[in-house]
Amino acid sequence: MGRKWANIVAKKTAKDGATSKIYAKFGVEIYAAAKQGEPDPELNTSLKFVIERAKQAQVPKHVIDKAIDKAKGGGDETFVQGRYEGFGPNGSMIIAETLTSNVNRTIANVRTIFNKKGGNIGAAGSVSYMFDNTGVIVFKGTDPDHIFEILLEAEVDVRDVTEEEGNIVIYTEPADLHKGIAALKAAGITEFSTTELEMIAQSEVELSPEDLEIFEGLVDALEDDDDVQKVYHNVANL
């Protein structure tokens, strides 16, 4: 699964330059999680998970606190999750996950991006069946066999455990992501660089330089949209 790990790292690195955009997207996600339950992360597991992910992305504490305070203050915005699927050039596929307070705006924007950037938006399920929803946990380490034993003993449903560039990379069934994190914390592992649910392509394609330029423009435009939280694709050389 080295290629999958490389793609996850590349995606996270590519976003590091757009810090203000990352902060804003996490602010929305934290606010939405706090509004859907208690605004206290110790009483709201969804909120706690989002905050942990925000910290991994180096989102400042004041951004996190501001989003929670907004929820506590009775902010009246309601956010809805969505998923849009489509195609780029030469067998490339793309999934955009959204969190929006205005679904009509989001649908219009996503459709426009696909149309203007050389893609075609598809029906629900037209692409996602070629991706596996997967829990991904990453932390510093070099002994995947030992980690696998910890997870096996905790009855975590694990797809794979690998060592990549000095990191332990764990792929779990999506329902067991939090169980896996808890098992690792119980074993004394508390520092994670990634704890995410990812849509991982079952197979990948490589695009020509010309097609890659078109596809990269499509991905960048989707990621720049304020309502788009995550973008997944099956292009190996992006």
Swiss-Prot record:
Q: Does the keyword Cytoplasm apply?
A: yes
Record's family? Belongs to the TACO1 family. YeeN subfamily.
* Entries under Gene3D superfamilies matching the protein: 1.10.10.200, 3.30.70.980
Keywords (alphabetical) are:
Cytoplasm, DNA-binding, Transcription, Transcription regulation
Can you name this protein? Probable transcriptional regulatory protein YeeN
Q: What is the lineage of its organism?
A: Bacteria, Pseudomonadati, Pseudomonadota, Gammaproteobacteria, Enterobacterales
Query: Entry's InterPro entries?
Result: Integrase-like_N (IPR017856), TACO1_YebC-like_2nd/3rd_dom (IPR048300), TACO1_YebC_N (IPR049083), Transcrip_reg_TACO1-like (IPR002876), Transcrip_reg_TACO1-like_dom3 (IPR026564), Transcrip_reg_TACO1_YeeN (IPR026562), YebC-like (IPR029072)
Q: Which is a Pfam family this sequence falls into? A: TACO1_YebC_N
Location relative to the cell: Cytoplasm
Cellular component per GO? cytosol
Q: Which NCBIfam families match?
A: PRK12378.1, YebC/PmpR family DNA-binding transcriptional regulator
One GO BP annotation here? regulation of DNA-templated transcription
Q: Does this UniProt record's set of keywords contain Isomerase?
A: no
Which GO molecular function annotations are given, in alphabetical order?
A: DNA binding
Instruction: Determine the domain of life of the protein's source.
Output: Bacteria
